[in-house]
């Protein structure tokens, strides 16, 4: 009986260790691929095994923003530095039923615009460009960031 229990535990451990996320499987496939590197993107996965928002082509200046499921949200282009703003903006735009929902304004490089304004309320505030974290309180009207 004791040996049977050990075998079951080992089988469960081995089976659990083999389960990989879609991103991890995709990364392995691309790592093994023989396609030329400039044409190939080896996806980066986060600690949970989901796709990281910023995905860049190896040995290239071209990057794109992807959602957690591996769907590209932007075309690959040079100069993309961050994707949190683009991911947040696209998520809000997919949920069209939220009248009055705040949609962040993003720069061409994917960072948050320094000044964010809520179209429904007329309030504006300054944010940290990479994280989107507020650095000023919202005020009515525009302000200098």
Swiss-Prot record:
Protein's name in the database: U20-hexatoxin-Hi1a
Domain of life: Eukaryota
Upper taxonomic lineage: Eukaryota, Metazoa, Ecdysozoa, Arthropoda, Chelicerata
Subcellular location: Secreted
UniProt cross-references to Pfam families, sorted A to Z: Thyroglobulin_1
CDD domains: TY
Record's keyword terms, sorted: Disulfide bond, Protease inhibitor, Repeat, Secreted, Signal, Thiol protease inhibitor
Organism whose genome encodes this protein: Hadronyche infensa
Main location: secreted
Function noted in UniProt: Cysteine proteinase inhibitor.
Cellular component terms (Gene Ontology): extracellular space
